[in-house]
């Protein structure tokens, strides 16, 4: 019987890669916590109706890409294809709006879409996202954009560009929709099959087509910016002004429409020239009607999601794989020494030092070679004599200096030793 392998469109995040993921999560959590965003953890699967109502039945996500099944109670269940709908459902269900103020929330976790797998796009993929609920102010739009750029720049990403558009309010979009259909209808036979289908049910999505012929046709399409009402136009102008005041560069892209029906007013994407076809690292916008659509009170909101797989592809181009290196590597030989080694390892870990214990039981020479390969700052050596005398040999790996300490002395000098390890660690990292 053959070995079972991971399903197509999924992949294992192996130990040597996990450091990148932890780095992204740590940076995002630090930046978002400083802006008073609180983490929320909705379920991975929800009632299918949540996404049909929230995302829109005419979207590709709902029509083609969702993992939907019946559970044993004959309920229609869907693995979440995105994070916003679940956060909004939780916001409504738990009356988070009752405080009357702004709710700043963020989340991270896996999402699921049945797509053709390629670099940076999997059927199980991961996002970090945020939602700012309760403010229709243009400053909220700029706040979330600024936080996204802060995260990406803190991670060291270069060659980023911010595409910006407004899709207006519902009335603006209805007026524009008709103008777009009137323009595209004479070209229907020349559009790609997906766009021909969208012409009737979701024509704005044609602007986002990747088909070259369709893209050429759309170049001369009317711009949605020409159909914005006074209120929508003012909101968008204020967003642009404040982005400029923050020195956040952007370019207007009237063809930018997000793939989900709930967006209103500001829509944006952050892209990288270093990613090829899958260039979008972050996408988001305002969705003032979604809370009402899902049964809650009228609540303006804005948010975004960062695709972690694509972000990590960029990090891997920028930096070597993050590795864990121990402060101390413990080598021991002999039953009593090996037991004492484990006890010391635990005590040192409790003091905040990273410690690797050699469990091979092999000769000292082989253990020393392994210690050297780990990049450890120091090595603790315990043999029969040390075990008998309750001592250890402390060897600094860079200088080969070695000293004998009683185990009591070692533990009593831990604070001083920690400072020495900090200096060695800083020197090594530099």
From Swiss-Prot:
Keyword Cell inner membrane listed: no
Catalytic activity: tRNA(His) + L-histidine + ATP = L-histidyl-tRNA(His) + AMP + diphosphate + H(+)
Subcellular location: Cytoplasm
Family named by the database record: Belongs to the class-II aminoacyl-tRNA synthetase family.
MF terms in GO: ATP binding; histidine-tRNA ligase activity
GO cellular component: cytoplasm
EC code(s) of this entry: 6.1.1.21
Subunit (UniProt): Homodimer.
Record Gene3D superfamilies: Anticodon-binding domain (3.40.50.800), Bira Bifunctional Protein, Domain 2 (3.30.930.10)
Keyword Glycoprotein listed: no
InterPro entries: aa-tRNA-synth_II, aa-tRNA-synth_II/BPL/LPL, Anticodon-bd, Anticodon-bd_dom_sf, His-tRNA-ligase, HisRS-like_core, HisRS/HisZ, HisRS_anticodon
Keywords: Aminoacyl-tRNA synthetase, ATP-binding, Cytoplasm, Ligase, Nucleotide-binding, Protein biosynthesis
S-S bridge residues: none
Gene name linked to the record: hisS
The name this protein goes by in its record: Histidine--tRNA ligase
GO terms, biological process: histidyl-tRNA aminoacylation
Main location: cytoplasm
